[in-house]
Amino acid sequence: MKARAIVVTSGKGGVGKTTTTANLGAALAKLGEKVAVVDVDVGLRNLDVVMGLEGRVVFDLVDVLEGRARLRQALIRDKRVENLFLLPASQTKDKEALDPERFKEVVRALLEEEGFDRVLIDSPAGIEKGSQTAAAPAEGALVVVN
């Protein structure tokens, strides 16, 4: 069975997790998969910038988790790559805003209700709460090292 929810992680910052997430997401989408890339690096989000979508962020992951926005409202469709969508992290909230059980529900909804074939989760660096939350719904992991 292939992993449908994959966390892209590392023990330290600056190794290329975000770049790997964006590029793998684009490659899978170009192969015909419907892909959601989810930025869980609350407070230090960058996946939207790497993908060129920073000007289109209205709602984010924390808005969804805290009930201020529906999941579909927060998803941003990449106009350059068909079948590629971004769920951005919050730029202002603290990592404590992430609840692992609620995040599992968001990933489940992406796969089961929104029909995504694959969810790639861009994890914050380290082994603290943010990275643990990012890994909670994952069925597989891609560990980026340098």
Where are these regions (language model features)?
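Walker A/P-loop phosphate-binding motif and the immediately C-terminal alpha-helix
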Residues: 2-41
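Flexible glycine-/small-residue-rich
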Residues: 10, 39, 88-91, 123, ...
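A conditional alpha-helix N-cap/helix-loop micro-motif detector
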Residues: 18, 99-100, 124
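Hydrophobic anchor at the start of a short beta-strand
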Residues: 34-35, 119, 141
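P-loop/Walker-type NTP enzyme "switch/lid" segment
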Residues: 40-117
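Glycine-rich phosphate-binding loop used to anchor ATP phosphates in small-molecule kinases
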Residues: 115-130
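Inter-motif core of Ras-like GTPase G domains
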Residues: 128-146
